[in-house]
Amino acid sequence: MTEVQKLTNNKEVIAYLVEKFPLCFSLEGEAKPLKIGLFQDLAEALQDDERVSKTQLRQALRAYTSNWRYLHGCKAGAERVDLQGNVCGILEQEHAEHAAQQLAEAKAKVAAMRAAEKAAKPEKKRPARRVAAKGQHAKETTTNKAKVTRKPKVILNAIELASLQKGDSVKVKVGESAKKAIVLEVVKDSARVQLENGLVITVTAEHLFA
């Protein structure tokens, strides 16, 4: 025996009702006003249907008749229909006004919720930006301090190129730092030196220090 797959939510139940009673219920377009007391007819028609319970039918019917599409179609003089789509009454002015009031209240509620959400979003973002900026500033300050701390204070004394000999230890200024080197050869206004890393370069007198 095949197990019956029960419906689990209003959306599924309403879709099932549209399938069973297409002349009464609909998912698109303007919905038709329903017969007064339709729930009883619905409960009797589906009393042996294991897929849906009376409680589910009541909840789904309430959701269907509270939908904006249904309320929009509830105008004075509109024809009410039964499960088979037969006309069984006219929507009275009182009921039409009640439907219009429900529709207006529902729209106002949604508009208020959207406005509240829109107003709340900037409030959440601003502190985050301020914290991020503060954190970034602190990070930059720490980094700058670290850089300043790491820079060694190098004392450089000018040296006469003519006094240099092969094998002398000197300092070569490279950018903002000074690197130790050994003199390999002195030629006119420059000298060939070997840095600690083994690199051999030729530098002019203004870059050589004791």
Curated annotation (Swiss-Prot):
The organism's superkingdom is given as: Bacteria
Recorded hits in InterPro entries, A to Z, give: ProQ, ProQ/FinO, ProQ/FinO_sf, ProQ_C
- Basic residues: compositionally biased ranges: 123-132
Q: Which GO terms describe its molecular function?
A: RNA strand annealing activity; RNA strand-exchange activity
Q: Where found?
A: Cytoplasm
Region (Disordered) location:
118-146
A Pfam family (short name) is ProQ
One GO term (biological process): post-transcriptional regulation of gene expression
Quote the cellular component terms of the Gene Ontology held in the record.
cytosol
Q: Which UniProt keywords apply?
A: Chaperone, Cytoplasm, RNA-binding
Q: Which NCBIfam families match?
A: PRK04950.1
Entry function: RNA chaperone with significant RNA binding, RNA strand exchange and RNA duplexing activities.
Q: Which family does it belong to?
A: Belongs to the ProQ family.
The protein's name in its UniProt record: RNA chaperone ProQ
Record organism? Pasteurella multocida (strain Pm70)
